[in-house]
Amino acid sequence: MVSPTAEQIPGHKGKVPERFLRQLQEDIAWRRIARGLQRLQVQRTLVDSCGLRQKGAAVLLGYLAQWVDIGFARPALIKQLLARFPSKERETLSLLEYVHLRMAEGLVAMSEEEFGKAIRHFEIVLALEDEIRDKQVISIANFWLGRCLRRQGRYGDALGYVAKAKGLAIQLNYPKMAAVMQVLEGWIAFQEGQPEGAARILGEAEEVLAETDDYVTRGNISSAYGRIARRQGNYDQALSRFGKAIEEYGKRDPFNRYLARSFVNIAFVKRLLGLQLRNKIDVEAARFRKKRTRTATTSFPKLQGREQLKRLREEAFEHLTKAREIYDRYDDHRGKGNVYITYGYLYLDNGDLDRASSVGATAFSLGEEKKDSILKGRSRILQCAVECAKFEEQIEEGSSGSSSQLACEYAREAVEFVRQTQNRRLIAKAHIALGLALCLDFSDGVEAARQCTDDAIAFLQPLSHDYVWRELQELKRKLRGAGNINSTLREWSQGIVGSKSFQRVSEEFAAIVIPKVWRREGCKVARVAARLSISPKKVRRILRNQGLLTGSENG
């Protein structure tokens, strides 16, 4: 916070020492973080007195913005100091001072997730590039603009600015500053589906920064390694990398928002580990049920892994709670939205569909506030998955039609939102979600679902066998089932029945039709029997054969 004394003297007379400004610039360029932070604390009175009538104050404010980005103070400090430089009085500033003020304004906009506004500030700075001798600030402007574009999911656009920022840093003989920019370059390579190239780029930056105390950037490197490991299905390695990132971030600030991001990443990995474990438990349970049909006296064993599954879920929720506390401090909409989305998938996995639906809607509203296409797209994908689950489970009477329709609407909106970005993987996920939603009712959606599959495959190249790939396989499996049904009906319409008797054909037809009518009739056996004029006993038998009713259920 700006001290009360400084507030009384916003026009503090005197001059900001050029040596002090040069030291701040050099400490940033050489990533001497602790030294720079200490220097600012020693000169706190000078910082707090920063005002329009103080020579060099605007340049100081520009450097302060860079140090706030590193962790010196909250962006609110820059916002308060900017109020001392009203637009109508800036005509007396030099071009360099004006550029630094624009950088400070861009930093504030960036911290408030107003990325379009921030981009405009940085574009003004870059438009004056030829008139500015201080190329370090031009390098930072390119870098920050690239960061904004990356947050918007415009990876290809971002890469050009990041490359220019790094090139300028190298020309200025600032290899450590260039390495910081290289980390973002590696992250973009990862998002573009180049994990090996990303790891190589990150490794080069890691080597340069290893002897510095730039713990935030070092943490970002570990975090990026964690995401690469997660994408490749190496969940234990991913947890280790995220743990290392948390350790690095904690050396600088226990409430760093990057720290919150790592907590969310760990929670999501533990969710994926939980899904793996649950699938293993389900396989063991199915194997035992099959064995028990041959030995009626065998009691059902206590399956191993249930306690571990419970523990993984509890730990995931604990990590999300920590992340949410940090994001609340910054009012970070994207961060809070990602927390809610991860909550949503944990609720969905556990069958708590009402809570999953609620947090999905909350995440979407956060994205709507900031016009965040990525967050809105992710939220709609979650909401689509919830409606698909409602349809499959038929938890509300007469809900099948509305759930399938809502699922398709959410998925189509997701596709629309994410197509405003260059996030190929997220676009693929949206197409998979739409394909799965269309599979809920095959009356007119088979070809559209097949097109969704083709689109997803195109955007997922090169393929990696992670959870998104498994979702794609699930979509393909459902489409194969639809193809089998359609081909069977087509053959029957042409009189091709092979050696099947009419009774056998009737039974197979009933097995196709009855489950669909049962869903449309709110999962009520009596309604199906009345509508089709058949025995309720036959309806129950067919539903049980397909695993839609247990032995104790009557529908």
Question: What do these predicted ranges mean?
Answer:
Residues G495-G555:
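Bacterial C-terminal helix-turn-helix
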Residues A58-V59, H100, I140, V180, ...:
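Residue register of alpha-helical TPR repeats
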Residues I28-R44, V68-F85, E113-I124, R154-K164, ...:
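Helix-turn-helix repeat elements of alpha-solenoid scaffolds
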Residues F72, E112, I132, Q152, ...:
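Structural motif corresponding to the intra-repeat A-B loop/turn of tetratricopeptide repeats
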Residues L275-E315, E392-L406:
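Short coil/linker segments at helix-helix boundaries
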Residues R44-T45, L82-R90, E123-D130, A163-Y174, ...:
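Amphipathic alpha-helical segments of tetratricopeptide repeats
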Residues L52-K55, L96, Q136, K176, ...:
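Residue signature of alpha-solenoid helical repeat architecture, marking inter-repeat boundaries
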